[in-house]
Amino acid sequence: MSLNDYPQQVNKRRTFAIISHPDAGKTTITEKVLLYGNAIQTAGSVKGKGSQAHAKSDWMEMEKQRGISITTSVMQFPYNDCLVNLLDTPGHEDFSEDTYRTLTAVDSCLMVIDAAKGVEERTIKLMEVTRLRDTPILTFMNKLDRDIRDPMELLDEVESVLKIHCAPITWPIGCGKLFKGVYHLYKDETYLYQTGQGSTIQEVKIVKGLNNPELDNAVGDDLAQQLRDELELVKGASNEFDHELFIGGELTPVFFGTALGNFGVDHFLDGLTEWAPKPQPRQADTRIVESSEEKLTGFVFKIQANMDPKHRDRVAFMRVVSGKYEKGMKLKHVRIGKDVVISDALTFMAGDRAHAEEAYAGDIIGLHNHGTIQIGDTFTQGEDLKFTGIPNFAPELFRRIRLKDPLKQKQLLKGLVQLSEEGAVQVFRPMMNNDLIVGAVGVLQFDVVVSRLKTEYNVEAIYENVNVATARWVECADSKKFEEFKRKNEQNLALDGGDNLTYIAPTMVNLNLAQERYPDVTFFKTREH
């Protein structure tokens, strides 16, 4: 590769994730995006009936049964002279930690809103996470083939609840059975909707000009007039698109459409490739790393077990921050101080894996992991630096895991530690007994753990209630005081999967008392990986 080629390769990368409330249509949008990127030939309807293919991006056994994307997969596809990396985030309300971490690996997000429902609680939470890094947001108002709320009201709600300015790019003409298409405010064009084009891409009829009589013929006089009246109002009351405000995360361009009807998806893809930022610089402990730097750096934001049921393997997902990966190159695994030769990294089309010959800043590659890589690990071409800002949250729910066969204790521990390194669950081993306590941010995670212990480690386990209300990581600068604290609180102390000391409190009152009694000890609710 010539040196001139490198900036060009980086500049055409766009790495984004989709955030939404469960059932707002995220998986359908993911499919349609892949259809436009020529990554899949036909878009199957997500909850396929036995014979139909399941949605391409949901591939684990339990996901197949439940029809939810439990794990984050990565898909790369070309679009408009760009190379787009889409990180699929878990759509189920339980899987927040994995989602939060995925959002640290993208440069922009698409927020999908069910236009019949408006802003929902999960979207609010996810937006808070994107705020931590001022991630630019594009918005897609979905499901216009159903009856929706007033579009102006939807924009007002996004602005007041999510505290972000809206700049409509397209505007809907009717909805539900009367949905006729959208008008593009900046191109002065109307795109007409036809039903029944869900799984393939078809030519869309375009009418130029808002006052073109063809428009009245196509959508009917009433809807055409309604559109003109609404646009007068919209132009007066809403924000114009401003690229700088968008990049700063203060303004979101809004598109309307229906993912199921495969309409409007290309409009936001055009917006994404034209406006969303190229791979961005990233804060490390010693300096800021620019994506234009020639030397390779990257961080691991997710670990996933058994992406290939035929291979009992685990894959660490690494976001390339700078430089170029080439097959067989030597990288430094900074945390353990070892050099490793990476000869078989993977690139992704969800569920299909290909060996990566090369990857650039902004890309995600998969590293085969035999238990040495953890979330938050940094890889470089020799420099000692660690990327920051990959969070671990104190769990909110706890269960004790118990074996049906007590002789399998070793396999159980191995399985739980691996699942905790992967970020699927957190595991705590109390100092005073041989219990194994798992902590999660949502109930469904416990089911996932039990089912994966069985399928992947051949361990039959059950979970039961345990007297733990919350957990905090503890540290203290004064070793003498820390020793005293540890001696007096042994019954409440445990080690997590990474052997970090944790205080497990039976009640919030107990935690508050401990914090009052030991002011020199710091109790952390989150910690960096």
UniProtKB/Swiss-Prot annotation:
CC annotations in GO: cytosol
UniProt binding sites for GTP: 20-27, 88-92, 142-145
Record InterPro entries: EF-G-like_DII, EFG_III/V, G_TR_CS, P-loop_NTPase, PrfC, RF3_C, RF3_dom_3_sf, RF3_GTP-bd
Subcellular location: Cytoplasm
GO annotation (BP), single: regulation of translational termination
GO MF annotation list: GTP binding; GTPase activity; guanosine tetraphosphate binding; translation release factor activity, codon nonspecific; translation release factor activity, codon specific
Keywords per UniProt: Cytoplasm, GTP-binding, Nucleotide-binding, Protein biosynthesis
Pfam families the UniProt entry points to: EF-G_D2, GTP_EFTU, RF3_C
Superkingdom to which the source organism belongs: Bacteria
Domain tr-type G: residue ranges: 11-280
Keyword Protein biosynthesis assigned: yes
Chief place of localization: cytoplasm
Family label: Belongs to the TRAFAC class translation factor GTPase superfamily. Classic translation factor GTPase family. PrfC subfamily.
Protein function: Increases the formation of ribosomal termination complexes and stimulates activities of RF-1 and RF-2. It binds guanine nucleotides and has strong preference for UGA stop codons. It may interact directly with the ribosome. The stimulation of RF-1 and RF-2 is significantly reduced by GTP and GDP, but not by GMP.
Protein name, UniProt field: Peptide chain release factor 3
Organism: Mannheimia succiniciproducens (strain KCTC 0769BP / MBEL55E)
Gene that encodes the chain: prfC
